Every structure is written in C-alpha cells, then in structure tokens.
Amino acid sequence: GIPCGESCVFIPCISSVVGCSCKSKVCYLD
C-alpha cells in the first residue's frame, strides 16, 4: 500500500527486489 515512487506501465517494477509489486500501473509496497 505504500507507493515506491515507480510506475510499471511499460516495464516491471525494479523495486520488486525490495518487495514492491505492480498495482494500477504504480509500484507499491503493501
């Protein structure tokens, strides 16, 4: 639920390495 400051419209979340995931075109951490 916390924005990771990254979008995932065209590419996956680079921040997924720290647990962020793509939700509604934005990367979120829980």
Curated annotation (Swiss-Prot):
| Similarity comment: family membership | Belongs to the cyclotide family. Bracelet subfamily.
Annotated GO biological processes are: defense response
Report disulfide bridges, numbered on this chain: 4-20, 8-22, 13-27
Q: What is the name of the protein in this document?
A: Cyclotide cter-F
Say yes or no: keyword Glycoprotein present. no
Q: Which residues form a coiled coil?
A: none
Cited InterPro entries:
Cyclotide (IPR005535), Cyclotide_bracelet_CS (IPR012323), Cyclotide_sf (IPR036146)
Record function comment: Probably participates in a plant defense mechanism.
Q: How is it modified after translation?
A: Contains 3 disulfide bonds. This is a cyclic peptide.
Q: Mind telling me which SUPFAM superfamilies this protein's record contains?
A: Cyclotides
The alphabetical list of record keywords is: Disulfide bond, Knottin, Plant defense
Pfam families of this UniProt entry? Cyclotide (PF03784)
Cross-link Cyclopeptide (Gly-Asp) residue location(s): 1-30
Give the comment on domains. The presence of a 'disulfide through disulfide knot' structurally defines this protein as a knottin.
